[in-house]
């Protein structure tokens, strides 16, 4: 008899839940709920299980916030809960709550070639360290290492490291943003809001007033070539994405590959492909040769968070991925 577990991927707006075949890892019956419609995550889980007439005793839910102990308070939502209490209330034997980028990193060993688009480099080396990052509402970062036949995710808040410019143009951007926000993290330029920051800094550095644009506006104007400032901002975004990915590769020797998780990059994929991304990735001076064979992939699987939550749980239950 097939055994299923509950898996979830929860952000500030929506909660996506599904069932995972514990043996195969297949994700089934995924459904998205608006977080605004429910008083708690537990309430959403109960609705999902009732709608699908599912009886499960194990679960893993990925959440877009730091996970540091039993008490989980979401960054972009009012939901807050005790993992132990929720596990008890649901009658689960196992309930894992993990960071959303922990889940994405755990999905990587499960991905097939048609779930990936490669941007330069050679072949990944088996069982070597992996980095994953993604620019969306914020900048998420995680690493994955292989230890004793197990994949171990190393979560963190790498998106909040200092933004380190490596060109005159980038130095001007830093100067402009520092005057506005003080500390300038990588997330201040590598995210949806970060794209707006880049555009504003470019315009203000030229002594002009920027328009009140959204990330979508900047992308559209860049792609139809109707705004030089927007095109510069998007080009710079791609280069800095490359630099940041190269930094991750250097830090942990990620010869297993560097992976970009969804976010805003797929919205301008053709532009990204022909941009200075790979040049920025390899622009490491004396250590260019160290990173030039490391492959970079864009993840195009439609639900890596659910896939990774399932992989994390299956490994916790004793399976070898």
Swiss-Prot record:
Transmembrane segments: none annotated. ATP binds at residues 8-13. Pfam families: Glucokinase (PF02685). One of its GO terms (cellular component) is cytosol. Its EC number is 2.7.1.2. The keyword Transferase applies. Keywords: ATP-binding, Cytoplasm, Glycolysis, Kinase, Nucleotide-binding, Transferase. SUPFAM superfamilies: Actin-like ATPase domain (SSF53067). It is an enzyme of class 2 (transferase). GO terms for molecular function: ATP binding; D-glucose binding; glucokinase activity. Disulfide bonds: none annotated. It is found in: Cytoplasm. GO terms for biological process: glycolytic process. It catalyses: D-glucose + ATP = D-glucose 6-phosphate + ADP + H(+). Belongs to the bacterial glucokinase family. HAMAP family: Glucokinase. This is Glucokinase. The lineage of its organism: Bacteria, Pseudomonadati, Pseudomonadota, Gammaproteobacteria, Enterobacterales.
